[in-house]
C-alpha cells in the first residue's frame, strides 16, 4: 500500500478532526470508565487469594494432627501383639486373602475409581490448561531436513570383487554388456605389465591393438604436434583405461592400426592390465550377437558424444569429418572391377587415403561371363587435387539455394567427362558398348526420378546417361555395394534383389536431420551429395533456413552407415548437389542381409571410421566413459578440476557443503548438460559435490583435450565464452532471487524440467490407469510423449525382458524412447515388482498419487519406494472428484507424514476417472477421449506444464484500492485463453491472488473482493481500532478480522494453485517468501504498511514482517500470511509470524512485483501486473541549500509559481522503496516477463469505494491489451497449447515403427520381440500384435511445441480384448462382416514367414473386431481395412520389402473416414 497520501493529508490538517477531537474524547472516556473497573477487580482478586491461602493452611494443619494421632495409637498397641503368631491353617488363609486383595486393587485400576484416580484427573486437567494455547494454534508443517542419503554420495565399497577384475569389468563396459561366460573368456587373455617411472606404455608406430587398464600407479597420455612438440592429453589414474573405439573397429575389420600421434608414459611405478583386442575376435566368432551389439554400442557413443556434444558445446561441425577429394577411376568398359584398387582404399584407415583409386564400372554386367570379355574400351580416371590447407572451411547453405558453390564437386555426368576431355563424351562410345552386351536376362530394377517437390517420375536421365542400359547400371551398382559391404562374389545374389536406383535433380533432399523413417545406405554412382547439419550458431531468424555444410559424398563413396548401425534417427540432412544417380538399400533390407552375413556390420562401421577426421581419433583416445549407479559421486568438493563431464543419460545433483557442515542443493543436471566446465577452465578446485540421482552415463573430457582443440581450432574459445556467459548470467539471476532465508532450496528453473516421470499409487483404490491417460492426454498438447507399462514392455521386447541377461536390450530401448520424446511416463505396478523397481531407477521425478479425501497414513509399499529411490525427487499428487465439489483440506497431515515429498499438487478430476470399469472399458473410453483437444485450464494440463518446464506464472503487485484492477485483469486473462499455473502477490495483490487460488471462479472471486472492499470503507470500525501511535496508528484487530473472515482458517498448502506471497522481514532485514503456512496471516503481513499497522510477528521464528513491496512489489493458515503481506508500516502493526516470531511488514517495501521470485520457482512465462503508485520525478532544482521558510512562502503565496520539493514523509517513503524500484526495473527489462500496468493512476490508494469502477478499467484495458498481443503474434508463448479451431487429423507414428533396433536380435534370430504368454492376453494394455504406442510424432523439433495439438488418430495400449463371453456374443452377431473384412495374408507370409504371418493375422482380426465393437473409437486404433491393405501392398511392390515393419502407418483423414464408413455399412 502507499503511505505517502495519508501522511500528506495528515500534515496538511485534513485529519485534525479525527485525531484531535474524536480520538481524544474516546480515549479519555474509555480510560475513565475502565480505571474504576480495573481497581475493583484488583481488590476482589487480592481478597480471594488471601482467603484461599488461609483455608489451604488450615487444612494442612488438621491433616498433620490427624496423622500424628494415628501413629501414636499404633505404637501403643504394638507391645500387646508382639508375642502372637499365626496358626498354620490361619496362615494360608491370611496370605490368600492378602493376595486376593492385591489383585482386586489391580483390577480396580481399570475403572474410573480407586487409588490415584483423583490425582490423575487433576493432572489431565492441568495438562489440558497448559496445552490450551497450543491446541488453538494452527497445524504447522514440520521442517524436516531431507535424509542424509538425499544430499550425500554413496561411499564406494567393492570388497567382494578383486580390484583387477573390477577395473577390467568397468573398462570393457564401454563396449556394452557382457555375460559372465564371455567376460571370463576375455579375462584369460589379460596380461600384467609392470612399468617404472618414465617407461613407455606405447609409442608412435606401435600397434594399436590393445585395451590398457591401470591397476596401480599413473599413466600420462601425450599427443605429438606437427612441429615435434608434445601436449598432455590426459592423466590415467587407478581404475581408468586407455583405449580407442575406432581402433577397435579397425582391428576387427582386419586393418592394422598404429599409433601415429599418441604416446603413453608412466609417471610413477605402475601396473597395467593389457587386454588384446584379438581376444574379442575369438569371442565374436562363437557369439556373433555380442559382436553386433558391441559395434552398435560404439556407433551410438560416437554419434551422441562426438557428433552431438562436441558440436553443441565446442562449435565443431565440419572439423569432425574428412572432406578430402578421393581419387576416382570411372571405367566406361564392361569388365571386372579391379579388386586390388578397391582393397587399397582400406590400407590406411586412420589417415587421409591419398592416392586411392576406386573404380566405378557403370557398364559391367552381373551375368557370369557376359560382357567380361568384350573389347577394350576407354578407361577414364578422374583425379582431383586434395583440399586446401585451410582448417576452417565452412559453408553456409540455404535450403532454397539451387546453385551449388564451385568447390570442385562433380556437377552431373557431363561435367565428369568435361573435366578430363574438355567436352562432353561421344555418344557413339556408349552406343557401341550397348551393342556389345547383347541380349541380357531380365533383372529386377527399381529406377525412379525424384523431383524437388517430392513427386516420383521416370523421365530419361540427364546428359549422356540416356543411352546407358539400366540393367548394366543395376549390375554395376550391385557389384559396387557388394564390395562396400565386404561380401564375396558368391554373395552377390543376396543383395541384388534389394538394390534400388534413383535419379536425382539438384537440391533434392534424401533425408532430413532427425528423421528415423527414411534411413538407407546410399552409394553415389554419378554426381555429388552434400551432407548438412543444422547451424547451432545461427540466430533464431536464420536457424530454420540455414544449414551447415559438413562434407561432400562423391562417386564411389557410401553414406548412411552411422544411422543404419545405431538404429536411431539420422544426424545429418543429405541433399543432392547436382544431377546424380545413386544406388541405395533400405534399412529393412540391410537387416535381412545381416541375418545371412553378420560381418557386414564391420564393413559398415569401417566405412564410418574412414570418414572421420584425425581430431576425432584424438578425442577418442582422450574420452573416458563413466557409468554411475544412483548415489555415486562424479567428483567431490575441493578436489582438483582436470576434466569436465557430459551427461549422456540420467540425472546429476550438485550439492555444496558449508563450513558448518550443512549441505545445500545448488542445482541438477539432465541429459546433454555439461558439468564442471567452469572449474576446469578457471583452474580452481571443485566448489560442489556432484552425484548421480539415478543410474547415469557420462562422458569424461579431460583438460588436455580442450587445450589441444583450442590450439588447433581457436573458434572453440568463442563458443566457450558464449556458453560460460550464459551460465554466469543465469547463476546471477538465480542468486538475486534466492538470497533470502525464505527462498526455496531448488532455485534452478532447469530442475523442474523432467524427461522421465514414474507414477506410483499409494493404495489399490487409486485409479492410476485413468490418471495416467489424463496426464498423457494433456502432455500430448506440448510435444511427443510416451506411456509405458510392464505389459507394454513385455509385448514389445519379450516376456523375459526383465531378466538380467536382457539388461542391455531393456536399457537401450528405454534410452531410445527417452531420446525421442520430451517426456516418458512410467506407470508402476501396484506391487514392488521388477518393473516397479525399474521405474524407480529410470525416473527423474516420482509422482506419488493418492486420494485427497482418504486417510493420509503411509503404506508399506510407499515406504519401500522411498527406500529404493532415496535421492530421486518425489512429488505428491492428491486427486479430488469433481462431482462432490470438495476442496483440498488437511494437506499438512499428508505432507508431515511424508517428509521426503518436496512438492504437492491438487488435481480436480472429472467423473470418468473414478468410474469402476474393466480395463477394456477404460481403454475404450479413452480411445475416444484422446481424440479430443485437452482442456488447457485443467489441473492435468497445469501438472503437464510443470513437468515439462512450461509453467505460466501470474504476479500481482501492490497498490491499495487500485488492486481491484487485478480482478478485471484476471477476467481478461481467462477470456484470452491464458492458463495460470502459479500465482504470487504482494500487499493487495496477495489478497486477490489468494482469492483466485482458493476459488478459481471469477464470479466468486469478484463477490468476495467486493465484500472486503466494502468493509474497508466502514470508517467507524477503523476508528475503534485506533491506538496510541507508538508503533502504528491502528492496532490491526479489525483489519485482521476482515481478512480472516474472507479466507477462514485455510492453509497455503490447501490452495488449488501453487501460491506464494512476499513480506518484508524487519527482524532479519530481508524479504521472505511464504509458500506454506497460515494464509490470512501472511496476506496480512504483506499488507502491513509502515506507520499505519504494526508489523506481523512470524509465528515460526518471531521475526517482524512488513509489506513485501518495500523490497519487491511484484512477487500455514492462509489469512495470516495475507494479513502479513498487508501490514502497512505505521498504519497496521507488524504481524508476528507464529512459527519463528519474526515481524512481517508489507512486501511492497522490498519487491512490489516479484516476477523474479516467480521465475526462480519454476515459471517459464510470467505475466506481471503492477498497480502501484508512481513517484513524481519532475522536481524543482532549488540549488545547494533549502530554506523551509522559503517553501512555506511559496506554498501560501498564490502569486508565485509552485515548487515541487519532497517533504519529509515523501523522502522517507522514497527511501523505503529504493530496493523496490531497482527490482522493478530488472523485471521490466527481463525476457521471461510480460509487464502490464493498467491506467489506474487517477485512483487513490484508499479509494476502496470505487471497486467496480477500478475493476472495469482493468478489464477493458486487459482485454484490449491481449487482443493486440494476439494480433502481433506475441500471445503464443502464453496460450500456445490453446486451439479454437476444430480438431484435425494428424498422422502419428507408432512405437513399433520407430522402435529400438537390436541388431543382435535381428541378425542372430533371437526370440521374437512380440511373443507374449497366453496369461498376458487379457492383461492391461493388451493387443494381439504387441504394443502400439501413444500418439506421438517422434520428431523432436522445437517448433513442434509451438503448434497446437489437434485431435487426431491415436494408437495406444487400449486395444485389450474383451472376455471370452463378450467375444463369442459379438462374433455371433457379426460373423459375416468378420469374414468379409479379413485381410489376405499371402503377401505377409512370403515376407515374414509363417509364424509372423499368423501373428499378423491375429492382430488384424483384433483390429477388425475393434472396428466392429466401437464406431467412435476406430479412429484411434491402427487398423487395417481392405483399402489400406491394397495400398500397403502397392507400396511394398514399389519400394521393396520391409522385413522388420511390425505395424503399418495410418493413412490420411479422408481414407480413414471412408474406410470407417464402409466398415459401419
Swiss-Prot record:
Keyword Iron-sulfur recorded: no
GO molecular function, one term: lysophospholipase activity
Stretches with biased composition (Low complexity): 1378-1390
Cellular component terms per the entry's GO annotation: endoplasmic reticulum membrane; plasma membrane
Compartments where located: Endoplasmic reticulum membrane
Keywords: Developmental protein, Endoplasmic reticulum, Hydrolase, Lipid degradation, Lipid metabolism, Membrane, Neurogenesis, Phosphoprotein, Transmembrane, Transmembrane helix
Catalytic activity: a 1-acyl-sn-glycero-3-phosphocholine + H2O = sn-glycerol 3-phosphocholine + a fatty acid + H(+)
Region: Disordered, residue numbers: 331-421, 434-460, 1371-1465
Residue ranges annotated as motif GXGXXG: 958-963
Superkingdom field: Eukaryota
Quaternary context: Interacts with Pka-C3; interaction inhibits the catalytic function of Pka-C3 and the esterase activity of sws.
Protein name, UniProt field: Neuropathy target esterase sws
Annotated organism of origin: Drosophila erecta (Fruit fly)
Amino acid at each position: 500500500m502507499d503511505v505517502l497520501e495519508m501522511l500528506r493529508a495528515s500534515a496538511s490538517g485534513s485529519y485534525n478532526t479525527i485525531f484531535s477531537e474524536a480520538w481524544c474524547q474516546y480515549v479519555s472516556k474509555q480510560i475513565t470508565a475502565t480505571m474504576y473497573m480495573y481497581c475493583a477487580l484488583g481488590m476482589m482478586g487480592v481478597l480471594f487469594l488471601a482467603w484461599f491461602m488461609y483455608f489451604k493452611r488450615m487444612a494442612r494443619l488438621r491433616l498433620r494432627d490427624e496423622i500424628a494421632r494415628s501413629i501414636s495409637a499404633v505404637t501403643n498397641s504394638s507391645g500387646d501383639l508382639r508375642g502372637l503368631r499365626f496358626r498354620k491353617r490361619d496362615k494360608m488363609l491370611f496370605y490368600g486373602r492378602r493376595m486376593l486383595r492385591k489383585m482386586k486393587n489391580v483390577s480396580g485400576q481399570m475403572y474410573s475409581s480407586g487409588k490415584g484416580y483423583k490425582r490423575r484427573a487433576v493432572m489431565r486437567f492441568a495438562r489440558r490448561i497448559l496445552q490450551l494455547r497450543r491446541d488453538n494454534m494452527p497445524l504447522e508443517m514440520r521442517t524436516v531436513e531431507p535424509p542424509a542419503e538425499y544430499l550425500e554420495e554413496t561411499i564406494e565399497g567393492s570388497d567382494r570383487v578383486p580390484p583387477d577384475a573390477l577395473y577390467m569389468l568397468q573398462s570393457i563396459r564401454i563396449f556394452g554388456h557382457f555375460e559372465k561366460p564371455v567376460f571370463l573368456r576375455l579375462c584369460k587373455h589379460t596380461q600384467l605389465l609392470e612399468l617404472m617411472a618414465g617407461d613407455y606404455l606405447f609409442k608412435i608406430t606401435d600397434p594399436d591393438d590393445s585395451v590398457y587398464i591401470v591397476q596401480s600407479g599413473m599413466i600420462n597420455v601425450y599427443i605429438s604436434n606437427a612441429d615435434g612438440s608434445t601436449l598432455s592429453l590426459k592423466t590415467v589414474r587407478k581404475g581408468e583405461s586407455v583405449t580407442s573405439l575406432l581402433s577397435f573397429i579397425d582391428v576387427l575389420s582386419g586393418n592394422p592400426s598404429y599409433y601415429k600421434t599418441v604416446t603413453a608414459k608412466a609417471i610413477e611405478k605402475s601396473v597395467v592390465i593389457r587386454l588384446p583386442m584379438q581376444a574379442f575376435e575369438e569371442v565374436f566368432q562363437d557369439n556373433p550377437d555380442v559382436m553386433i551389439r558391441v559395434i552398435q554400442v560404439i556407433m551410438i557413443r560416437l554419434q551422441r558424444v562426438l557428433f552431438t556434444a562436441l558440436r553443441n558445446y565446442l562449435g565443431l561441425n565440419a572439423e569432425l569429418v574428412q572432406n578430402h577429394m578421393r581419387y576416382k577411376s570411372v571405367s566406361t568398359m564392361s569388365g571386372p572391377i579391379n579388386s586390388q584398387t578397391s582393397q587399397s582404399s582400406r590400407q590406411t584407415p586412420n589417415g587421409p587415403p591419398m592416392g586411392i583409386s576406386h573404380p566405378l564400372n557403370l557398364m559391367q554386367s552381373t551375368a557370369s561371363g557376359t560382357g567380361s570379355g568384350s573389347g577394350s574400351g576407354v578407361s577414364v580416371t578422374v583425379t582431383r587435387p586434395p583440399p586446401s590447407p585451410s582448417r576452417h572451411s565452412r559453408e553456409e547453405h540455404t535450403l532454397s539455394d539451387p546453385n551449388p558453390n564451385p568447390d570442385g564437386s562433380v556437377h552431373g555426368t557431363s561435367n565428369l567427362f568435361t573435366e578430363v576431355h574438355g567436352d562432353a563424351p561421344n555418344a557413339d562410345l556408349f552406343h557401341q558398348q550397348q551393342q556389345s552386351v547383347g541380349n541380357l536376362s531380365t533383372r529386377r530394377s527399381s529406377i525412379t526420378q525424384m523431383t524437388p517437390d517430392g513427386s516420383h517420375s521416370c523421365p530419361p536421365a540427364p546428359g549422356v546417361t540416356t543411352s546407358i542400359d539400366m540393367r548394366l547400371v543395376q549390375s554395376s551398382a550391385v557389384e559396387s555395394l557388394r564390395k562396400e559391404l565386404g561380401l564375396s562374389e558368391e554373395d552377390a545374389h543376396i543383395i541384388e534383389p534389394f538394390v534400388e536406383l534413383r535419379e536425382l535433380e539438384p537440391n533434392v533432399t534424401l533425408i532430413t536431420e532427425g528423421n528415423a523413417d527414411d534411413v538407407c545406405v546410399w552409394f553415389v554412382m554419378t554426381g555429388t551429395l552434400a551432407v548438412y547439419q543444422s547451424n547451432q550458431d545461427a540466430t533464431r531468424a536464420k536457424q530454420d533456413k540455414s544449414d551447415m555444410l559438413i562434407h561432400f559424398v562423391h562417386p564411389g563413396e557410401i553414406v548412411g552407415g552411422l544411422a543404419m548401425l545405431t538404429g536411431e534417427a539420422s544426424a545429418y540432412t543429405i541433399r543432392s548437389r547436382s544431377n546424380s544417380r545413386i544406388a541405395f538399400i533400405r534399412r529393412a533390407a540391410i537387416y535381412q542381409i545381416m541375418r545371412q552375413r553378420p560381418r557386414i556390420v564391420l564393413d559398415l562401421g569401417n566405412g564410418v571410421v574412414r570418414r572421420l577426421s584425425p581430431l576425432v581419433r584424438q578425442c577418442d583416445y582422450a574420452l573416458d566413459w563413466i557409468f554411475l549407479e544412483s548415489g555415486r559421486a562424479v567428483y567431490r568438493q575441493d578436489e582438483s578440476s582436470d576434466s569436465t563431464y557430459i551427461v549422456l543419460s540420467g540425472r546429476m545433483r550438485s550439492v555444496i557443503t558449508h563450513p558448518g557442515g550443512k549441505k545445500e542443493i545448488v542445482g541438477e543436471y539432465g541429459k546433454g548438460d555439461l558439468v564442471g566446465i567452469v572449474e576446469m577452465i578457471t583452474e580452481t578446485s571443485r566448489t560442489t559435490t556432484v552425484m548421480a540421482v539415478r543410474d547415469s552415463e557420462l562422458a569424461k573430457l579431460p583438460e588436455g583435450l580442450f587445450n589441444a582443440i583450442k590450439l588447433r581450432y581457436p573458434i572453440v574459445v568463442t563458443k566457450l565464452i558464449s556458453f560460460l556467459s550464459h551460465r554466469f548470467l543465469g547463476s546471477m539471476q538465480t542468486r538475486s532471487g534466492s538470497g533470502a532465508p525464505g527462498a526455496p532450496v531448488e532455485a534452478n528453473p532447469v530442475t523442474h524440467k523432467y524427461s522421465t516421470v514414474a507414477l506410483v499409487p499409494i493404495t489399490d483404490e487409486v485409479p492410476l490407469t485413468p490418471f495416467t491417460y489424463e496426464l498423457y492426454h494433456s502432455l500430448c498438447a506440448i510435444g511427443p510423449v510416451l506411456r509405458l507399462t510392464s505389459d507394454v514392455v513385455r509385448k514389445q521386447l519379450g516376456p523375459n525382458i526383465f531378466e538380467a541377461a536382457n539388461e542391455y536390450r531393456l536399457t537401450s530401448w528405454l534410452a531410445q524412447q527417452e531420446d525421442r520424446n520430451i517426456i516418458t511416463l512410467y506407470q508402476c505396478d501396484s506391487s514392488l515388482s521388477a518393473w516397479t523397481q525399474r521405474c524407480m531407477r529410470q525416473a527423474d521425478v516420482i509422482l506419488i498419487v493418492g486420494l485427497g479425501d482418504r486417510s493420509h497414513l503411509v503404506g508399506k509399499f510407499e515406504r519401500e519406494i522411498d527406500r529404493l529411490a532415496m535421492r530421486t525427487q518425489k512429488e505428491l499428487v492428491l486427486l479430488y472428484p469433481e462431482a462432490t465439489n470438495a476442496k483440498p483440506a488437511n494437506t499438512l497431515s499428508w505432507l508431515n507424514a511424508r517428509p521426503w515429498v518436496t512438492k504437492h499438487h491438487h488435481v480436480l478430476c472429472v467423473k470418468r476417472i473414478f468410474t469402476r470399469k474393466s480395463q477394456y472399458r477404460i481403454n475404450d473410453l479413452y480411445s475416444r477421449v484422446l481424440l479430443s483437444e485437452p482442456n488447457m485450464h485443467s489441473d492435468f494440463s497445469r501438472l503437464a506444464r510443470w513437468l515439462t518446464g512450461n509453467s505460466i506464472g501470474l504476479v500481482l503487485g501492490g497498490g491499495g484500492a487500485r488492486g481491484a484492477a487485478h480482478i478485471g485483469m484476471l477476467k481478461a486473462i481467462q477470456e484470452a485463453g491464458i492458463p495460470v499455473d502459479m500465482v504470487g502477490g504482494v500487499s493487495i495483490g496477495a489478497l486477490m491472488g489468494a482469492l483466485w487460488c482458493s476459488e478459481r471462479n471469477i464470479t466468486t472471486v469478484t463477490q468476495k473482493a467486493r465484500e472486503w472492499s466494502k468493509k474497508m470503507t466502514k470508517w467507524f470500525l477503523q476508528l475503534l481500532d485506533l491506538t496510541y501511535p507508538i508503533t502504528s496508528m491502528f492496532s490491526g484487530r479489525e483489519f485482521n478480522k476482515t481478512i480472516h473472515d474472507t479466507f477462514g482458517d485455510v492453509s497455503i498448502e490447501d490452495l488449488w494453485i501453487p501460491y506464494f506471497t512476499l513480506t518484508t522481514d524487519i527482524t532479519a532485514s530481508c524479504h521472505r517468501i511464504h509458500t506454506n503456512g497460515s494464509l490470512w496471516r501472511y496476506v496480512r503481513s504483506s499488507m502491513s504498511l509502515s506507520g499505519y499497522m504494526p508489523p506481523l510477528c512470524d509465528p515460526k521464528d518471531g521475526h517482524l514482517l512488513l509489506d513485501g513491496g518495500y523490497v519487491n512489489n511484484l512477487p500455514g493458515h492462509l489469512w495470516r500470511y495475507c494479513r502479513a503481506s498487508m501490514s502497512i508500516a505505521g498504519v497496521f502493526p507488524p504481524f508476528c509470524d507464529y512459527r519463528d516470531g519474526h515481524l512481517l511488514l508489507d512486501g511492497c517495501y522490498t519487491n512490489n512485483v516479484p516476477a523474479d521470485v516467480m521465475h526462480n520457482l519454476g515459471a517459464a512465462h510470467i505475466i506481471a501486473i503492477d498497480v502501484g503508485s508512481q513517484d513524481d520525478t519532475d522536481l524543482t532544482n532549488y540549488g545547494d541549500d533549502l530554506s523551509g521558510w522559503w517553501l512555506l512562502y511559496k506554498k501560501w503565496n498564490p502569486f508565485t509559481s509552485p515548487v515541487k520539493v519532497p517533504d519529509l514523509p515523501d523522502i522517507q517513503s522514497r527511501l523505503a522503496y529504493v530496493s523496490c524500484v531497482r527490482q522493478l526495473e530488472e523485471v521490466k527489462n527481463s525476457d521471461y516477463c510480460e509487464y502490464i500496468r493498467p491506467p489506474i493512476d487517477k485512483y487513490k490508494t484508499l479509494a476502496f469505494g470505487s471497486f467496480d469502477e477500478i475493476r472495469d478499467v482493468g478489464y477493458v484495458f486487459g482485454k484490449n491489451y491481449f487482443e493486440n498481443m494476439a494480433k502481433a503474434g506475441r500471445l503464443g508463448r502464453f496460450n500456445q497449447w490453446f486451439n479454437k479451431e476444430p480438431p484435425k487429423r494428424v498422422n502419428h507414428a507408432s512405437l513399433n515403427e520407430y522402435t529400438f533396433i537390436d541388431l543382435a536380435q535381428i541378425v542372430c534370430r533371437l526370440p521374437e520381440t512380440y511373443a507374449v504368454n497366453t496369461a498376458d492376453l487379457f492383461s492391461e494394455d493388451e493387443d494381439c500384435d504387441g504394443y502400439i504406442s501413444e500418439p506421438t510424432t517422434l520428431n523432436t523439433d522445437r517448433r513442434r511445441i509451438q503448434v497446437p495439438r489437434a485431435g487426431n488418430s491415436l494408437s495406444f495400449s487400449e486395444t485389450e480384448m474383451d472376455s471370452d463371453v463378450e467375444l463369442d456374443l459379438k462374433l455371433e452377431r457379426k460373423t459375416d462382416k468378420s469374414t468379409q473384412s479379413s485381410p489376405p495374408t499371402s503377401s505377409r507370409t512370403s515376407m515374414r514367414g509363417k509364424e509372423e504371418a499368423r501373428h499378423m493375422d491375429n492382430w488384424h482380426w483384433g483390429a477388425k473386431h475393434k472396428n466392429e465393437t466401437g464406431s467412435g473409437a476406430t479412429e484411434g486404433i491402427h487398423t487395417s481395412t481392405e483399402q489400406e491393405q491394397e495400398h500397403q501392398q502397392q507400396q511394398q511392390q514399389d519400394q521393396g520389402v520391409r522385413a522388420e515393419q511390425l505395424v503399418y502407418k495410418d493413412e490420411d483423414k479422408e481414407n480413414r473416414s471412408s474406410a470407417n464408413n464402409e466398415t459401419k455399412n
